[in-house]
Curated annotation (Swiss-Prot):
EC number(s) from the headed UniProt entry: 1.2.1.38
Protein name: N-acetyl-gamma-glutamyl-phosphate reductase
Protein's UniProt keywords contain Protease: no
Compartments where found: Cytoplasm
CDD domains: AGPR_2_C (cd23935), AGPR_2_N (cd17896)
Gene3D superfamilies: Dihydrodipicolinate Reductase, domain 2, NAD(P)-binding Rossmann-like Domain
NCBIfam families listed in its UniProt record: argC_other (TIGR01851)
Length: 310
């Protein structure tokens, strides 16, 4: 019997992307609630309970409600793409490449919290350095990032694309989260193994999909004042054998005149770069990904596959 997959919120940006990814799969049965009935709580509960895996593509409060509808129905496993459970100790963090054994934790879990798009890039850069002992736990980490506007969901998409929208945004790039209270920070701090709350400055560009995340560091403040090659080697070793995360060779990175945020749009991979100059003792770690790929829908499907033993 084919496993049943229910995408609760399949008509939203992330849900639609997941539905598209599963459309050609003949090894699954995707069960869908009619769009007109998506607010029917009792019917949603029936679909949730009928599924082998429920993928929640909902706002935080709605995700919490969906989880509550499954209380006492432990046969349904859950992947939550919201922020609601990413720092909850009972939920496996759905970043398969996070550390050794994480794939197995996801595969065996009933509850999986899909990572946020920005934290995916930032944690991919920070966590290996923490685990290797290069990055002190109390280092004052700063994360700068730009995302495609689809990361803001249907409302922001309309504001960026519809010139007749009452709140149309003409800006080609804008900063937000200005008070430094972005909801992704607790996740970034916990799974990045940081003692100090990192500074996170996100922005949105006038392009649909894509993302660049930057973590600049002073080499002299890292353990042993490592070289660029050493930092690169730590990342390379951490992601050795991974087919989704690619650490770009140092020599190749040194020849690049620029990094295009849209390079991986529509793809589920992630590229990591090490830039900098040892003359000034500075390194800039960069992650390149699709905010809707490895940053959302692609990761959800990857986690689903792991949970199904695929």
């Amino acid at each position: 019997m084919k496993p049943k997959i229910f995408i609760d919120g399949e008509h939203g940006t992330t849900g639609l992307q997941i539905r598209t990814r599963l459309a050609e799969r003949d090894d699954l049965e995707v069960i869908s609630i009619p769009e007109a009935e998506r607010r029917n709580k009792d019917l949603r509960a029936d679909y949730l309970r009928a599924a082998d895996i429920a993928i929640l593509c909902l706002p935080d409060d709605a995700s919490k409600e969906a989880v509550s509808l499954l209380e006492g129905h432990n046969s349904t496993r859950i992947i939550d793409t919201s922020t609601a459970h990413r720092v909850h100790p009972d939920w496996a963090y759905g970043f398969a490449e996070l550390t050794k054994g994480q794939r197995e934790r996801i595969a065996e879990a009933r509850l999986v919290a899909n990572p946020g798009c920005y934290p995916t890039g930032a944690i991919a850069l920070v966590r290996p350095l923490r685990d290797a002992g290069l990055l002190p736990a109390d280092y004052p980490v700063s994360v700068n990032a730009v995302s495609g506007y689809t990361g803001g969901g249907k409302q922001l998409i309309a504001q960026m694309e519809d010139r007749n929208h009452p709140d149309y945004l003409a800006a080609n790039n804008f900063l937000y989260g200005l008070p430094l209270k972005h909801k992704h920070v607790p996740e970034l701090q916990l799974h990045g193994r940081l003692d100090r709350r990192p500074i996170f400055s996100p922005s949105v560009g006038r392009f649909p999909q894509g993302m660049i995340v930057q973590v600049p560091l002073f080499l002299s403040e890292l353990e042993g004042s490592p070289s660029l090659a050493k930092v690169h080697a730590v990342l390379t070793e951490h992601y050795a054998g991974q087919d989704i995360v690619d650490v770009v060779p140092l020599e190749e990175s040194a020849k690049l005149p620029r990094v295009d945020a849209e390079e991986l749009a529509g793809k589920d991979g992630m590229k990591l770069f090490v830039f900098g100059t040892e003359d000034h003792g500075q390194v800039n770690l960069v992650a390149l990904l699709d905010n809707l790929g490895k940053g959302a829908s692609g990761a959800a499907v990857q986690n689903m596959n792991l949970m199904l033993g695929k």
